[in-house]
Design a protein with these regions (language model features):
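Membrane-proximal, solvent-exposed terminal domains/tails of membrane-associated proteins
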Residues: 184, 189-339
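Short Lys/Arg-enriched alpha/beta "domain-start" segment
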Residues: 1-241
Length: 446
């Protein structure tokens, strides 16, 4: 680390940025969302990456899986509302707003805060990673004001333009205060030069994850769940171009200049460089929150009396949705990208966000749903059998009464026929019984 930073001046001015990915629910029809290609208020952005396989690119480009929009037309109004509510928010620079909407009721707003290395402490105070309670009430007010400004300036506009009603992905109003705290983050930094050793970008990316000065030699032995990925070494200049640290709270990238480039990326170039990594992260966020929705639906199915009364139809629909998501909504790492390091980054993102564990849990709960389906089918068959038995008993009683009516006439031929029939039936059932006993004895002798 010390060798890397030798002869580097203006370390305080290293450009950094932070995407905060805010989860949402929406009500409305995904397929009915249409925006004119020339619309300047809500321009549609392409959800595609050169890192993706063609299979994934086609799925994302056709608009049936995800749609992406720039909502920077509301950026100025949102910032003004934020600053008007809390003056201390002027310390933070909000540079970009995007809206991602998926086809299953989940959506995201990404807010991008740009800052420099010298402002790392300020950003650390804003996020306060690793702590439930913030160090000051001012930070809570800044966060609440940001969320309220988005509700006022963005939510209504999205409803008007896209026809969907948004709400935060929370259980109740009280948990709204934890939205920013629990939101996944993408942290990025533009480094002044490329890396001779791939341990260097890992260390710098870890500092980015902890929201501290990138030049610090910072270590934390207690954080054992961090995973890393780096770009391949360039065969010409024999240097590495990037590295990332992946945790359950965020993914942090350290980008060096391009091959044979001596100048770091500027603010605009930094955001452009992070474009592919943002889209990769969004795919995992879609999987994470979809798993949460299915677990929620399954829980409600077994606890809500109203849903229980809906019975077989709702259960069948829930199973179908869950199986479709497991079959088509998720992709193995090898199907994500043609590049091994991107596949490994995706694999680590899935692992750290608990996607694979959640999928396994959903699969186990589908087994419970199958048992519930069998129980419902058994109850229905029992009801049908009871109805058939009841009609059978009624028929037998009616036949017996009719027979007694015939016998009561005193006709000797009728009485004799009835007795012969009864004796024949008794002999028939005795013969069946003796035959069954004989077969059992033969089986025992063998």
């Amino acid at each position: 680390m010390k060798t890397y930073w030798q002869n580097i001046t203006n370390r305080d001015n290293i450009d950094r940025g932070l995407y905060i990915i805010l989860p949402l629910r929406y009500q409305g029809f995904f397929q009915s969302i249409t925006i004119d290609e020339k619309d300047t208020e809500f321009p549609k952005l392409t959800f595609d990456s050169s890192d993706f396989t063609e299979l994934l690119s086609v799925k994302c480009r056709n608009g049936n899986f995800v749609k992406r929009f720039s909502i920077n037309s509301r950026l100025k109004e949102t910032v003004e509302a934020w600053n008007g509510k809390v003056a201390a928010s002027k310390e933070y620079q909000l540079d970009d707003l995007q809206f991602f909407i998926f086809n299953n009721g989940i959506a995201f707003i990404t807010i991008y805060l740009s800052y420099q290395n010298k402002d790392a402490e300020k950003m650390y105070q804003f996020i306060n990673p690793g702590y439930v309670q913030d160090k000051s009430e001012d930070i809570n007010q800044i966060q609440d004001a940001l969320l309220n400004s988005l509700e006022e300036k963005v939510f209504g506009c999205i409803q008007e333009k896209l026809g969907v009603t948004l709400s935060w992905f929370t259980q109740d109003e009280k948990s709204k205060r934890y939205i920013i705290k629990e939101a996944y983050r993408l942290n990025i930094a533009s480094l002044p030069k490329r890396f001779e050793d791939n341990e260097i970008p890992k260390r710098i990316a870890y500092n980015g994850h902890r929201l501290v000065d990138l030049t610090r030699d910072f270590r934390d032995a207690s954080e054992e769940d961090v995973e890393y990925a780096t770009g391949a070494k360039d065969v010409d200049d024999e240097h590495y171009g990037w590295g990332c640290a992946i945790t359950s709270q965020e993914i942090s990238y350290a980008y060096g200049p391009g091959p044979w480039k001596s100048k770091p990326r500027d603010k605009k170039g930094l955001r452009e460089r992070s474009e592919d990594d943002l889209l990769l992260t969004m795919i995992v966020m879609y999987q994470k929150y979809t798993c949460m929705i299915f677990n929620e639906k399954i829980h409600q199915r077994f606890t809500s009396e109203e849903r229980r009364l809906k019975g077989e139809a709702s259960l069948r629909d829930l199973k179908r949705e869950a199986l479709e998501f497991i079959s088509y909504g998720t992709l193995a790492p090898s199907q994500i990208s043609r590049w091994n390091n991107v596949c490994e980054t995706y694999r680590s993102l899935q692992k750290q966000n608990g996607v694979n564990e959640a999928l396994e849990e959903i699969s186990q709960k589908i087994t419970l749903l199958n048992e519930e389906q069998d129980r419902i089918d058994g109850e229905r068959e029992s009801r049908v059998s009871m109805i058939i038995t009841a009609f059978g008993l009624i028929s037998i009683i009616a036949a017996a009464l009719q027979t007694l009516d015939y016998i009561s006439t005193g006709n000797s031929l009728m009485i004799a026929g009835f007795l012969v029939t009864c004796v024949a039936m008794i002999l028939f059932f005795l013969a069946l019984r003796f035959d069954e006993i004989r077969r059992r004895r033969k089986q025992k002798d063998r």
